[in-house]
Amino acid sequence: MRTAAVPLIAAAIALGASPAIAQEREQVKVAFEHALPNVEGKRIVAVTVTYPPGAKSLAHHHAASAFIYAYVLSGTIRSQVGDEPAKIYHAGESFYEMPGSHHRVSENASDKESASLLAVFVVDSKDGPLTTPDKAPGSQ
């Protein structure tokens, strides 16, 4: 079976076919999570989001109670929240999202360098998930 595949692969290469390359997605890691002892019913969650060159997040919204402060750790991030125009943020800059916001664009603005940010959520203890991707058009 292995030898039978070799001529097929060679034919595909000769005809100019190339293997499909899946675009890398962002990587999200929880840095910490803790109940806020002086604010009953609230918790703080910090996540790092790392984008390979050219990577982007799907349009999404966050938990309804989530206030989010984002700080760009490295690279350049393009972000569009709600109906505001998209903005570019560089390492050392920050932005925030109000509860209930729709995050239309969140992506690495560079196709050559990676980018990362720290997102700090203040959210109701029982509210979740933190992020929900929009449904694709035509899906149910």
Protein language model regions, located:
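Ligand-binding loop in jelly-roll beta-barrel domains
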Residues: 78, 85-86, 100-127
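Short acidic-glycine-tyrosine-enriched beta hairpin
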Residues: 36-41, 51-53, 83-100
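Sec/Tat signal peptide C-region and signal peptidase I cleavage site
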Residues: 18-24
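Bacterial N-terminal signal peptides
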Residues: 7-16
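Extracytoplasmic
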Residues: 41-46, 64-67, 84, 100, ...
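Short, low-complexity, Pro/Ser/Thr/Gly-rich segments in the mature regions of secreted, periplasmic
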Residues: 130-140
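A short glycine-rich, His/Asp/Glu-containing loop-to-beta-strand
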Residues: 25-59, 65, 120
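Glycine- and acidic-residue-biased ligand/ion/polar-headgroup-sensing regions
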Residues: 65-84, 91-93
